[in-house]
Curated annotation (Swiss-Prot):
Gene Ontology molecular function terms on file: ATP binding; ATP hydrolysis activity
Binding site for ATP: 8-15
InterPro entries: KTI12/PSTK, P-loop_NTPase
Compartments where found: Cytoplasm; Nucleus
Keywords: ATP-binding, Cytoplasm, Nucleotide-binding, Nucleus, Transcription, Transcription regulation
Protein purpose: Elongator complex-associated factor that is not a structural subunit but rather transiently contacts the complex. Required for an early step in synthesis of 5-methoxycarbonylmethyl (mcm5) and 5-carbamoylmethyl (ncm5) groups present on uridines at the wobble position in tRNA.
GO-annotated cellular components: cytosol; nucleus
Protein name: Protein kti12
GO terms for biological process, alphabetical: tRNA wobble uridine modification
SUPFAM superfamilies, sorted: P-loop containing nucleoside triphosphate hydrolases (SSF52540)
PANTHER family: PTHR12435
């Protein structure tokens, strides 16, 4: 059932909003609204997985923590479970990876951005019993990649300000249960290319990236994609051609009904691969 990705600065109040949302969803389930009486709501976060805040000081430990979080989400996603992923989720590539997981499970998803000024996060953090170390807090806020509702993996996007009374539960329920998406503005709609051209670009772009990996995997663990700032971070284990082709087919299956230009496709595929490779380390 639905995946709710909560994102925001550290100490921005994400867990408070997640608990608030959990209660609101459970109230509706208790009332059997939309025949949901057999549903349940679960929150997955650093606390439930015993991930210490010091983990975010070293990139290797942080990658392992993201892998743990991703695996927990995978286990809990089911046809009768609301999964609230209450974590930093500050890397767009990881949010895209979670989006792909929800797509593969044929379920809905949304992103909730808990938008709180940095100064207020610092204040909240200083008042915590177990705060983030100051340097870790600053690093995480600096690296934060804010959700963008114009991208498919960050949409539908709900932004909750620090002084908002509550999350927009009615809208969230409609998106997750009734699958009602906000109608895009005509000025911002992407006109889809002819289907045959799009599928050709999807096939060619992904194949080009695979060939780039095969041509360079023996020389470096960080491959720069020509003509862009994109980098492919290879895992410590050997990446075989069958694995790459399987991931390529999975990506194509997820995106064949969409419409993106070549540059966006390349970025999405690189983000997808980086997310998958992280789970292999």
């Amino acid at each position: 059932m639905p995946l709710i990705i909560v994102s925001g600065y550290p100490s921005s109040g994400k867990t408070t909003r997640s608990n608030e949302l959990k209660k609101a969803l459970e109230d509706r389930i208790h009332q059997n609204i939309d025949n949901t009486k057999d549903y349940r709501v679960i929150i997955i976060n650093d606390e439930s997985l015993n991930i210490e805040k010091e983990t975010y000081r070293e990139s290797k430990n942080e990658k392992a923590a993201r892998g743990l979080l991703y695996s927990a989400v995978q286990r809990e996603l089911s046809k009768s479970t609301f999964v609230i992923c209450d974590a930093l989720n500050y890397i767009k590539g990881f949010r895209y990876q979670l989006y792909c997981e929800s797509k593969s499970m044929y379920t809905t998803h949304c992103v909730i951005h808990v938008a709180v000024p940095q100064d207020l996060c610092r204040k909240f953090n200083s008042n915590k019993e177990q705060p983030y170390p100051d340097d870790v807090l600053e690093q995480l806020m600096f690296r934060y990649e804010e959700p963008n509702g114009m991208t498919r993996w960050d949409s539908p996007l709900f932004t909750v300000l620090h002084d908002d009374a509550s999350c927009p539960i009615d809208d969230i329920w409609s998106v997750l249960i009734h699958n009602k998406n906000v109608k895009p503005n005509q000025a911002t709609m992407v006109k889809p290319p002819a289907e045959v051209n799009y599928l050709y670009e999807l096939d060619k772009t992904t194949q080009d990236v695979i060939m780039l990996i095969l041509d360079n995997s023996n020389d470096t663990s960080l491959i720069t994609v020509p003509g862009s700032k994109l980098q492919i971070a290879l895992p410590s284990v050997t990446v075989s051609l069958p694995l790459l082709q399987r991931l390529r087919r999975q990506f194509i299956q997820i995106n064949r009904q969409q419409s993106y230009n070549t540059n966006v496709l390349k970025e999405m595929f690189v983000e997808f691969l980086n997310g998958q490779f992280e789970t292999l380390d």
